Amino acid sequence: LLDKAERDGVETTYDRKQNFKAQCGFGLQGNCCRICGMGPCRITPKTPRGLCGADEHVIVGRNFARMVAGGTAALSDHARDIAHTMALASRNGNYTIKDESKLITLAKEWDVETEGRDIYDIAHEVADVALMEFGKPYGVARFLKNAPVKRQKVWKELGIEPRAIDREVATIMHSTHIGCTADIDSLIHMSLRTSLADGWAGSMIGTRFSDILFGTPTVRETEANLGVLEENKVNIILHGHEPSLSEMIVLASEDPELVELAKEVGAD
């Protein structure tokens, strides 16, 4: 593929890396700060603090915390989309409930009434509860109770139980802004809490809801990587792991009109 890219004149990440020659040494060490308008500031033996007074530990801590916030926002927004999708699911719609038993199990975990109710009514209420996990004003993430009790105790004692997902991201963003947190311990503390919001709130919602909507995965043989490409077929490659889009591409590929169109242009 790299040879083909070179022949076709397609620039790859390796080409761009080569063009960089030497990357910024301060950036590689993480002791360069460009968060506020007074900077950028870089730490050296002669200038051990930035203009705001932050030393290298605080600068690295702020940069790391913002990376955590960015990653949490990305994965959790994926979960938000899946929750929205389940809120719109319907029996005759494009998105339906594939794993009803997993939905019922989750509903009971969250104290959502299931007896005598239509499965889609249950799904919509569970979706609403999940969406509240992003901005609820009180309490901690619901999925924390699924962790081992010993681990829950550690999180509670350390004070890193995540609250609402969006709140943890916002806390990092404002705390790392100009004139705010300059204590490395506090920065690491909020980074840990936000990481747990990612893993035990956003990611858990995305995973459980994907199983409910699209079916719980089972072990099976399949093709991967370059093995999926065929000359005599229409090849559609999706970048990312958003199943709500992938499922609709699969649905569209089975549309008789589109299948006929593909055959007209030479596909098997």
Where are these regions (language model features)?
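Metallocofactor- and cofactor-centric catalytic cores in central/energy metabolism, strongly enriched
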Residues: 1-268
